[in-house]
Amino acid sequence: MKVLLDATAIPADLGGVGRYVDDLVPELIASGVNLAMAVQQRDVAHFSAKVPRAHLFPVSQSMESRGARMAWEQTGLPALIHRIRPDVLHSPHYTFPALHQVPVVVTLHDATFFSHPQAHSPFKQKFF
């Protein structure tokens, strides 16, 4: 099975979702998954060493702002899906392309967006 994992949302310090992805990807490879990863340029060396059998696809634009990453997720990620034709897209950070051509697995690490929306900004309340 070919899985495309969108690792573009992980923070530079690999905290939180980054730690989850960091622990997940070697297990996917060990289980026989043909793993492709969309990664930020700054993470190429890390994931090349962590999972040398994964196919890395560095994103070409800066993902420093949330808006830029989300725009890429809705435009660049579908283009990458079309190009490499994975069986499944795994989005480990809540969001995924609105238009997608493959089954999607989304990991929710925190459900308070739904159970306690008042704890989040108005933008996140509406978005999630």
Enumerate the predicted regions with their spans.
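Carbohydrate transferase catalytic cores enriched for Leloir-type hexosyltransferases
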Residues: 1-128
